[in-house]
């Protein structure tokens, strides 16, 4: 039997791309471009400064603080606060700022703890606020100062202060020789160390402890939790500098 040869056409395939494939190609190009942009953003966010700026723009809004009259008690920024436990989301925001913005720094993860009816309990309430901002668990404090039913005694002796610092794992802030902090200096301390306990003289001329949580250059003020008066209070920076307990080396403490 003879098999007839079959002719095969070897004409080259057309290189023309069907018109309906164009949107797919464009979509792939866009996806590749977006992926490249994402990689670039991830790369550019590798520095602490860029991460701080991204955190600020995504977490913080612009907070306006009304500066109170000199010598008066301080205005609350928010009525929402916790009364003992630590925050579930330890979310901190850091210094904002390009050349056209006013720097704002505020730690939002610091729980508020009141001293309640304890007349001399500000130091222990502050220890709880700072401690619970970084870890759960009981605070050591100074149990020996809790005697009787009237609450704790104050931190009167340097030996008490030293034991308090040791028990709570606190560190002193190096105070400037000129006895004056700028917004930038306080913002850098908060960014590096978190909330800071500070001792100061109140408008009633009594020594007291509170917790520094933020600064706002636009209103020339600081933000702080006060165990007696409430959370998220504002104080003029000049007032803070005048009233800080500069005469003692433990005027400012952090974890």
UniProtKB/Swiss-Prot annotation:
Outcome of mutating residue 122 to Y: Deficient in both cleavage and recognition by RPS2 plant cells. Fails to elicit RPS2-dependent defense response. Localized to the chloroplast
Propeptide residue range(s): 1-71
Enzyme category, top tier: hydrolase
Keyword Hydrolase carried by entry: yes
Entry GO MF terms: cysteine-type peptidase activity
Residue stretches of biased makeup (Low complexity): 86-98
Region (Disordered): 1-50, 76-100
Keywords: Autocatalytic cleavage, Host cell membrane, Host membrane, Hydrolase, Hypersensitive response elicitation, Membrane, Protease, Secreted, Thiol protease, Virulence, Zymogen
Catalytic residue list: 122, 208, 226
GO annotation terms (biological process): proteolysis; symbiont-mediated perturbation of host programmed cell death; symbiont-mediated perturbation of host transcription
Site label Cleavage, positions: 71-72
Substitution effect: residue 71 to A: Partially cleaved. Mainly localized to the chloroplast
Outcome, altering residue 72 to A: No effect in cleavage
Subcellular location: Secreted; Host cell membrane
Mod. after translation: Autocleaved inside plant cells upon activation by cyclophilin. Cleavage is crucial in subcellular location and in eliciting HR. Inhibited by cyclosporin A (cyclophilin inhibitor).
Enzyme Commission code(s) on record: 3.4.22.-
GO cellular component annotations of the record: extracellular region; host cell plasma membrane; membrane
Region named Determinants of cleavage specificity: 70-71
Main location: secreted
Outcome reported for the amino acid change (mutating residue 122 to A): Abolishes the normal in planta processing, RIN4 degradation and fails to elicit RPS2-dependent defense response. Loses its ability to inhibit PAMP-induced growth suppression
Subunit description: Interacts physically with plant cell ROC1 (Arabidopsis single-domain cyclophilin) and RIN4.
Role played: Effector protein involved in gene-for-gene resistance in plants expressing RPS2. Its thiol protease activity is required for the degradation of plant cell RIN4 and consequent activation of RPS2 during bacterial infection. The activation of RPS2 is sufficient for the induction of hypersensitive response (HR) and plant resistance. Cleavage of RIN4 by AvrRpt2 also interferes with RPM1-mediated resistance activated by either AvrRpm1 or AvrB. Contributes to virulence in plants lacking the resistance protein RPS2 promoting pathogen growth and disease symptoms.
Other comment: Only naturally present in strain JL1065.
Name listed for the protein in its UniProt record: Cysteine protease avirulence protein AvrRpt2
Organism, as annotated: Pseudomonas syringae pv. tomato
Annotated gene: avrRpt2
């Amino acid at each position: 039997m003879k098999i007839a040869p079959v002719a095969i056409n070897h004409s080259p395939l057309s290189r023309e791309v069907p018109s309906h494939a164009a949107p797919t190609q464009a979509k792939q190009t866009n996806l590749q471009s977006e992926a490249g942009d994402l990689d670039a953003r991830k790369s550019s966010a590798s520095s602490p400064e860029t991460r701080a700026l991204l955190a600020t723009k995504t977490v913080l809004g612009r907070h306006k603080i009304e500066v109170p009259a000199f010598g008066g008690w301080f205005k609350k920024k928010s009525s929402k606060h916790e009364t003992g436990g630590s925050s579930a989301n330890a979310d901190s925001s850091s210094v904002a700022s390009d050349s056209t913005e006013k720097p704002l720094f505020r730690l939002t993860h610091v729980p508020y703890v009141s001293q309640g009816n304890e007349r001399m309990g500000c130091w222990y309430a502050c220890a709880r606020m700072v401690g619970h901002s970084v870890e759960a668990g009981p605070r050591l404090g100074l149990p020996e100062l809790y005697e009787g039913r009237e609450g704790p005694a104050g931190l009167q002796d340097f030996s008490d202060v030293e034991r308090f610092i040791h028990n709570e794992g606190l560190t002193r802030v190096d105070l400037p020789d000129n006895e004056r902090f700028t917004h930038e200096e306080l913002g850098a301390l908060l960014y590096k160390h978190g909330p800071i306990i500070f001792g100061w003289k109140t408008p009633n001329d009594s020594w007291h402890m509170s917790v520094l949580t933020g600064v706002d250059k636009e209103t020339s003020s600081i933000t702080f939790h006060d165990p007696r008066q409430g959370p998220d209070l504002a104080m003029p920076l000049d007032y803070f500098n005048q009233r800080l307990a500069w005469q003692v080396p433990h005027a400012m403490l952090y974890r």
